[in-house]
Amino acid sequence: MTDLHTDVERYLRYLSVERQLSPITLLNYQRQLEAIIHFASENGLQSWQQCDVTMVRNFAVRSRRKGLGAASLALRLSALRSFFDWLVSQNELKANPAKGVSAPKAPRHLPKNIDVDDMNRLLDIDINDPLAVRDRAMLEVMYGAGLRLSELVGLDIKHLDLESGEVWVMGKGSKERRLPIGRNAVAWIEHWLDLRDLFGSEDDALFLSKLGKRISARNVQKRFAEWGIKQGLNNHVHPHKLRHSFATHMLESSGDLRGVQELLGHANLSTTQIYTHLDFQHLASVYDAAHPRAKRGK
């Protein structure tokens, strides 16, 4: 057994005896560290003292090339950093060579937006009871203002200014923003407020459950999914998809990335750029109409 294996065995015993980690967690550590042992041996290392940041980076690159996903690589590097930290604490290493090495961020999988025709079909629900009116109002507000789910369920009646067609929301980081919600949303909120007292609630919440309490995020998710099925949409409807659709449709219509950023409450423009995607056909038409080099010569 090489010094590489010996040190890993010692570390695993430490995790088992002193840290009292579960067998499954220990097995995960063992698998990750066996991968680096194999790589180090291939590169002629006899001890961990010979390992440097370049070797760790090469190990990360090799892992990615062999098909390891970004999230799995992050776990592998985390296990390696913990192991090297332990070696430093045992005076086996002077510094942790993996400390400055990080895995690439996992790609963000954005939900597909609902196109305008399907959105109109979703909103055209059969209003046959007060809860259906409530759901129509929630759908209109969510799509009309691009709210986060937490912002929707957190709305109180006092946050409304129906005369101006605006709503105040508390976003991430306790940041308030004032948003237009559109005349359709205003009309359906007014319709819902006429029925809201049927639930006999003294709660300040705008949207109530059938028990008269503030509606929960889970309940909203469930109701939106049910309406998607009832209205014959082919894809799963959830609150985040409505927010994404709002952003996409606004950006396609206006091209104003900064304006959409403000409406969504994003701190960084880069978040909006990732979150909203213009389809290539729309971009091409904008380019053809606006760019001087795209115009046909006379």
From Swiss-Prot:
Main location: cytoplasm
Residues covered by the Core-binding (CB) domain: 2-88
Residue positions of the active site: 148, 172, 240, 243, 266, 275 (o-(3'-phospho-dna)-tyrosine intermediate)
Activity regulation behaviour: FtsK may regulate the catalytic switch between XerC and XerD in the heterotetrameric complex during the two steps of the recombination process.
Family annotation (Pfam families): Phage_int_SAM_1, Phage_integrase
Compartments, as annotated in UniProt: Cytoplasm
One annotated GO biological process: chromosome segregation
DNA-binding is among the record's keywords: yes
Source organism superkingdom: Bacteria
One GO MF term: DNA binding
Cysteine pairings via disulfide bonds: none
Gene Ontology cellular-component annotations: cytoplasm
Entry keyword set: Cell cycle, Cell division, Chromosome partition, Cytoplasm, DNA integration, DNA recombination, DNA-binding
Gene3D superfamilies (alphabetical): 1.10.150.130, Intergrase catalytic core
Domain Tyr recombinase: 109-288
Subunit and partners: Forms a cyclic heterotetrameric complex composed of two molecules of XerC and two molecules of XerD, in which XerC interacts with XerD via its C-terminal region, XerD interacts with XerC via its C-terminal region and so on.
PANTHER family: PHAGE INTEGRASE-RELATED, TYROSINE RECOMBINASE XERC
Annotated family: Belongs to the 'phage' integrase family. XerC subfamily.
General function of this protein: Site-specific tyrosine recombinase, which acts by catalyzing the cutting and rejoining of the recombining DNA molecules. Binds cooperatively to specific DNA consensus sequences that are separated from XerD binding sites by a short central region, forming the heterotetrameric XerC-XerD complex that recombines DNA substrates. The complex is essential to convert dimers of the bacterial chromosome into monomers to permit their segregation at cell division. It also contributes to the segregational stability of plasmids. In the complex XerC specifically exchanges the top DNA strands.
Full protein name: Tyrosine recombinase XerC
Protein source organism: Escherichia coli O1:K1 / APEC
Gene: xerC
